[in-house]
Amino acid sequence: MNLEIVDLFNGHVNSIPNILPHQLATLDYLVRSIIDENKSVLLFHIMGSGKTIIALLFALVASRFKKVYILVPNINILKIFNYSMDVAINLFNSEYILENIFIHSTTSFYSLNYNDNVINYNGLSRYNNAIFIIDEAHNIFGNNTGELMTVIKNKNKIPFLLLSGSPITNTPITLSNIISLMSDENINFGDIIIQGKKVFQILLNENGVNVLKNILKGRISYYEMPSTDLPKVQYHGKKFLDTRVVYCHMSKLQEKDYNNVRKLCNNEMFEKNMNNVSLAVLGQLNFINNLDILFQEQDKELYPNLKISNGILYGDELTTLNISSKFKYFIGKITSLTGKQFIYFSNSTYGGLIIKYIMLSNGYSEYNGSQGTNPKLINGKPKTFAIVTSKMKSSLEDLLNVYNSQLNKDGSQIMFLFSSNIMSESYTLKEVRNIWFMTIPDTFSQYNQILGRSIRKFSYFDISKPVNVYLLATVYADFDDDITSLEDYSLDEINTLPFDIKKLLYLKFKTKETNRIYSILQNISDTYRMPPHPYIVELVLGEIVRQFFYHHSRISFDSKELINAIQLVLPNIDMAKKYINEVVNGHFFVSNKVFDKSLLYRYKNDIITVPFKLSHERFVWGVNFRKEYNVVSSP
């Protein structure tokens, strides 16, 4: 990161269309490392810091010299990248060749390069002299995409830009895959990793630390958004190590079936079953693997006060909630909370069934669906919920547009957004005031990713109000342990604890090692001080102009203040004046604090900001913005 660029923007205004200082500073580093030196880079920027825009700005710069291939996890994130590309282009006041940029989902890229599940090696020559940008890079390994990337890297000797807010998903092994893609070193991972009996006992040894430092030195960009730009996070519940957890004590009914299932699930292979009964017990549903079979039952009794018929749950148990200590706490708590709520859960089939009918039975209506019993209202309209799963790929974008809209700032359109793992990455949620974990996440990465959907820059109009986080753990009726240290229990003792508590402790063990490695990556992150790289000088100057004319509506054409600002990048006064003349005659777009959206014009001996707005006739049949010439028809 070029700190000299950051220093150009003291008092930077972030509330207008802009490129943030750290984004420009990182862009400078990427140009020097990837384009000039042909090195691969890991962009390890914590969630919410604008990795996508940095990557797309870099793609636009690189498109002048090479073809750029961008890989994203799925079709919904592809839509986000396409939208963000329009944002990046609007901020990009320099030349680019859009035809040299190709954005693919991993599935479409797979189809493009495989024939009958075999890599089409002859077709890989198209990637010679290219650059690859991979979003959520930690997720591509262990599948065909990871295999293909390794083949392309070895065959074409091209650089990669890997984007990740959490490069370790579960264990250091994930990071080892990233290292192999970024370098030409042949690493025996048995030499750098200590392998224990449990997953959380996989550690990086001293040799591994040295390998990490030696290979990744000069290949890491680390950045974390200052917390001053974010709302305070208020964790609720009982103190648990360095966080807080809400203990949800089971009823006798839940504890009985919970224990029965646990006896059958004595190792991590059956974690799904334990996640289910930790969320809620449903009698026979807990003991079969194919839920679809039971969903076809007619009036099947699960408990005396709970039945299932054609996949529909009904009965008083959905309101007394002896089947779920978590939902008993949740339903009781939300009546006193205001604002939008985001709720994470796993096992979408089982969890989605429970959520839907508990919410309906307790007066909450389904968005664009069934109305709740005795509906609870907000502003005279039913309080609604939506459940997001991987099956919603086509409609997710529309749903999130409603959830994030200004009209829904108070949750009056959609108040409760329940989501499975599909929402753990790349999406942005706005104005969420309450975040719930109905399932304990599997990894530190997943936990941070879920929080990062909401707690991010520009997601809150008022950052003085806190965001509440509720991490719920199902526990036995008599369990009330204070857990203050990872040394409180032996491994044998941990196995006897409530499943959620055991999972939390495992998570914290893994988090300890993850944080150790992240600290190493942070320390070897590249920072330097140099004038902006020639390829991005226009972008830096453009941001200086945007910031200057936010504060100034009218100035003299030979304003010393403006000339001095430009000379920070173009020291030669003639070049500085020439640049000012070009941006004024080109009617550069700015956002002014008085006139808002404006264009720069010369009026006599002054530079003025002229406000504008786009308008159209009342009845417009069509405007095709993809054509060079547009024809607008109206009555």
From Swiss-Prot:
Helicase C-terminal domain location: 326-505
Compartments it resides in: Virion
UniProt keyword Transcription regulation, yes or no: yes
The protein's Enzyme Commission number: 3.6.4.-
Entry annotated with the keyword Transcription: yes
Main location: virion
Entry keywords, A to Z: Activator, ATP-binding, Helicase, Hydrolase, Nucleotide-binding, Transcription, Transcription regulation, Virion
Motif (DEXH box): 135-138
Record InterPro entries: DNA/RNA_helicase_DEAH_CS, Helicase/UvrB_N, Helicase_ATP-bd, Helicase_C-like, P-loop_NTPase
Transmembrane annotation, as ranges: none
Residues engaged in binding ATP: 45-52
Chain ranges of the Helicase ATP-binding domain: 32-185
Single GO MF annotation: hydrolase activity
Gene Ontology terms: cellular component: virion component
Domain of life according to the entry: Viruses
Family: Belongs to the helicase family. VETF subfamily.
Subunit structure, interactors included: Heterodimer of a 70 kDa and a 82 kDa subunit.
Described purpose of this protein according to its UniProt entry: Acts with RNA polymerase to initiate transcription from early gene promoters. A DNA-dependent ATPase activity is associated with VETF.
Protein name, entry field: Early transcription factor 70 kDa subunit
Recorded name of the encoding gene: VETFS
